[in-house]
């Protein structure tokens, strides 16, 4: 996912700046991706078209990266295998990027169903490895980050809630308690 899915989420000034640059350059800009960028927005909007009453929309992604061979993405980018201290130092750019993507998805859905986003709450949980293990991208040492669970909750007008959740695990054994999606019992 590259961003620019719904630039309006960052305010009218940001949107106007992008629109002016596109006009000036004689181009258009279309951000896309899998989630967010397609699944996190298109499926909920399609499903709401078949709904009579909506109070809560939950989109939950769960990805396991043990077979993904890119050290640059899994370890350097997502910070799997980093200590909590390293994460605190290195995570600002990663968290800002992810947060921007998932907030755009919330704002896009909200506009699609005709409600206003009042605020977005963010929640992050990190789980460390209980033992050393290897994944395709490299080593995950005991005590380093092995799973991440992020949740963005968009509190909207008309008492509607839009939740985007992303669960990233370095292995199937990392945070097995997160196998059930948020809000589903």
Region annotations inferred by a language model:
Residues 1, 29-32, 58-59:
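General beta-strand structural signal in soluble alpha/beta enzymes
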Residues 2-5, 34-35, 62:
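Short, ordered loop/turn segments at secondary-structure junctions
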Residues 2-28:
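Rossmann-fold NAD(P)-binding glycine/threonine-rich loop
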Residues 5-7, 38-39, 126:
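Short secondary-structure capping/turn micro-motifs that flank functional sites
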Residues 7, 32-35, 94, 98:
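Glycine- and other small-residue-rich loops at beta-strand/loop junctions that grip anionic moieties
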Residues 15-19, 44-47, 106:
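Short amphipathic alpha-helical segments and helix-helix/interface helices
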Residues 38-50:
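Alpha-helical support elements that line or immediately flank enzyme active sites
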Residues 48-184:
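Active-site-lining helix/loop region of Rossmann-like oxidoreductase modules
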